[in-house]
Amino acid sequence: GHLPRGKLDDFLAMIESAASYVVRNGPVTGEDRWEEDAGYSPFTLAVEIAALLAAADMLDACGKNEPANYLRETADCWNDQIERWTYVTGTELCAREGIDGYHVRITPPDGAGAASPKDGFVPLKNRPPGDSHRPAEAIISPDALALVRFGLRAADDTRIVNTVKAIDALLRCELPQGPLWYRYTGDGYGEHEDGSPFDGTGRGRPWPLLAGERAHYELAAGRPGKAAELLETFERSAGAGGLLPEQVWDRPDLPERELRLGAPSGSAMPLVWAHAEHIKLLRSLRDSKVFDMPPQGVERYIKRKTVSPFRTWRFNNKIRSLPAGKLLRVELAARGVVHWSSDKWLTVRDDNTVENAFGVHLVDLDVDGLQPGSTVVFTFFWPEASRWENVDFTVGIDPSDSQ
């Protein structure tokens, strides 16, 4: 590493606290990176998983191997399920674009069962009344490129390539300076069609920031020429003073509104994280690689193809099934006894949870020998409160080739 052991210790408490928050609250996010929706977001999942792997390396360096192993186990489990949570197949868009599927922007947070990207609706902010919910499968976003940026998926992974085709079909906007992209399908954060300012509703316009992110994807895919072209597009989207705007105008000129095609809209300017992305892109192009890509995921998932031996059930992620051959890990926020059966209560087992270094109370249920079609049913006894949960939860055993 770049820091001596003594310096690492100075950061350890902060890293442990951050990792604890992620493992206790993930994989679902309460708010996506656009500060709008809760659920399973490819972007947030990528950040969470990459962060856990990096934190694990830090803990190992400080001699905390058992907590480090737990972080990697959690990262592996979440990484295994990214496609189940966020990748849809067999939609109208798939048929139209000749692809088998694509990653969606976000899927609803878990309620009574595990999220399916084809089930449920996602609330859209900044939309007029009566038009504020869309099927999750209908909302595309460039956010899925984060799976490559953070080292979890190869740029040429078929599902990533399919997603890029879907992104370009719905979100790419050709402008005088080159192509830019919208945030997501149906975005209402931007000026109205007549150029009047955003007033709680409107229409989202292209974000130069996303050209920088796409350039990093092109570089990861081995296309530095395309990345360099997008750098030029990115820079040509700046205002007269060289400041990068949040959004640019994508309609014919409206001189009376001071809006010109391809020029900054009335959005925030400068958008500081767009400038940060610009600086990172300059560095990446100089290095001929994505310089800020965390190496842990690349090594673990792309090269070694590590998979998880279990699936996790928790109250914010109540899985309804797991592949045959996997253990069932139950994670709780308080000490509990898992009262469970795999034969419709003919026989019963009681397994106590154990608290780990991050305040997670967990136990692994030995269900890896159950055959497909079996069902595990369980409830909880809470010793501290001396009460039963009084609700039964079930997890079915699927064929081993299911996610």
Task: Give a label for each model feature.
Residues 42-59, 214:
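Extended, hydrophobic/aromatic-rich amphipathic alpha-helical segments that build helical scaffolds
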Residues 1-9, 29-36, 55-73, 154:
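Inter-helical turn/loop segments and adjacent helix faces that build the functional surface
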Residues 8-23, 49, 53-56, 68-83, ...:
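Hydrophobic core segments within long, regular secondary-structure runs in both alpha-
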Residues 293-403:
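Glycan-association/targeting regions that enable binding to alpha-glucans and other polysaccharides
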Residues 23-40, 119-130, 256-264:
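Acidic/His metal-coordination segments adjacent to aromatic residues that form catalytic metal sites
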Residues 134-154, 205-306:
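C-terminal capping/lid segments that line or modulate ligand- or cofactor-binding pockets
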Residues 1-26, 45, 49, 274-275, ...:
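Aromatic-rich carbohydrate-recognition surfaces in CAZymes
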Residues 42-43, 49, 69-209:
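Extended ligand-binding clefts on enzyme/binding-domain cores
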